[in-house]
Regions:
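Alpha-helical structural elements
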Residues: 5-8, 32, 56
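Intrinsically disordered, low-complexity segments enriched in polar/charged small residues
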Residues: 9, 17, 36-37
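Hydrophobic membrane-insertion alpha-helices, especially the h-region
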Residues: 14-29
């Protein structure tokens, strides 16, 4: 009887020990799983946080990325540049942030090149005289306005509007190379020195007149533009050929590559804005009649960038108001960071896109 009791006692001890060992083992396994689970969660949470943080930083960077072509508070400067064939090739156009091309007398065109004062090239020209309708576009930029002479209407508007100008006829800040009419040039230092002498501000808070993005924004849709031809007159036409590798348009005039006089580099446009405007003759000049434009009002056109185009409408309510350009859905166009050519073309000619 006593022996049986001892056996039961031993069994009881063994069961207790086994239970204790099992409990210890279970605790060890459970603790290890908890640690592993927490460790995995820590890694996952850290990875998720880092990924989300990267996305937020990238999105913020993309949102805040500012265009280089028009940055800072440096004053805008407009220079009237000849585009008669005798003036080719011109100097300094590659530094411009925007260039307007409009029809003038004799079926020729003239450029108004716009720069930031801190990005003026050493040589700009040949510089020619002002025409009154360019001043309506210049008002959108509030620039120091450099020209060599003026038409009667341009003279009136410059004086009436108080345009801060540099006129080569009276202001000896230009220099000549060679003979003829297309031989006047102006330098960066001459413009800045004259501005300081006259007390013209060299800083501005003037915003870019159109929407401008620091990112590369493509036009929606499938309207491809690899080649563009614009006709200004029987004498003058402009063509662009798309360079898909660099996402720019290479510029030519009358079948000849448009190059810079100094660098010999072909002129490249990131954006091309075509505005169709009615032009007509004025009777204020003996010889080839000077032109006028119906550029205050509204019309149609095209916007071309990155190998695509969209039809647009334009509206300019008065001379000192910006030209508002919208696509056919009513959204204002967004220009990409780079040189923009504003092609103000006679509306009687077709725009060829292919």
């Amino acid at each position: 009887m006593r022996k049986r009791k001892n056996t039961r006692k031993y069994i009881k001890y063994i069961v207790v020990i086994i239970c204790f060992v099992i409990t210890i083992l279970l605790m060890f396994v459970f603790k290890r799983n908890i640690l592993n689970y927490n460790g995995l969660n820590k890694i996952n949470i850290k990875e998720i946080f880092n990924n989300q943080n990267d996305k937020v930083i990238k999105a913020k960077y993309e949102k805040e990325k500012k265009p280089k072509i028009y940055s800072g508070n440096s004053r805008n400067v407009a220079v009237m540049v000849s585009n008669e064939k005798a003036a080719w090739p011109q100097a300094g156009l590659l530094n411009a942030y925007m260039i307007y091309e409009c029809i003038i007398e004799g079926g020729e065109t003239r450029f108004m090149a716009l720069y930031k004062a801190d990005n003026l090239p050493e040589k700009i020209g040949p510089v020619r005289s002002s025409r009154h309708y360019y001043l309506d576009y210049a008002a959108e930029h509030d620039p120091i306005y450099a020209h060599f002479g003026w038409s009667d209407l341009a003279m009136q508007r410059i004086k009436q509007r108080g345009v801060q100008n540099i006129n080569g006829i009276y202001d000896k800040y230009y220099y000549r190379e060679g003979g003829g009419y297309n031989n006047a040039f102006v330098s960066k230092n001459s413009i800045l020195d004259f501005a300081k002498q006259k007390g013209y501000p060299l800083t501005t808070n003037k915003e870019f007149p159109l929407k401008l993005s620091g990112r590369n924004v493509d036009i929606e849709g499938e309207n491809i533009c690899n080649n563009l031809k614009l006709t200004y007159s029987q004498k003058h036409n402009v063509t662009y050929k798309y360079d898909a590798e660099n996402k720019v348009y290479l510029r030519s005039m009358r079948g000849i590559n448009h190059v810079d006089r100094v660098t010999k580099e072909q002129i490249k446009a990131k954006n091309i804005v075509v505005l169709k405007v009615k032009n007509f003759n004025l009777n204020d000049y003996v010889g080839s009649p000077r032109q006028d434009l119906n550029n205050i009002g509204s019309g149609e056109g095209y916007y071309i960038t990155n190998g695509k185009y969209t039809k647009v409408t334009w509206n300019k309510s008065q001379y000192n108001q910006n030209t508002v350009i919208k696509d056919l859905n009513g959204k204002e166009i967004v220009l990409n960071d780079g040189l923009t050519f504003m092609q103000i073309v006679p509306d009687k000619y077709d725009v060829e896109i292919y």
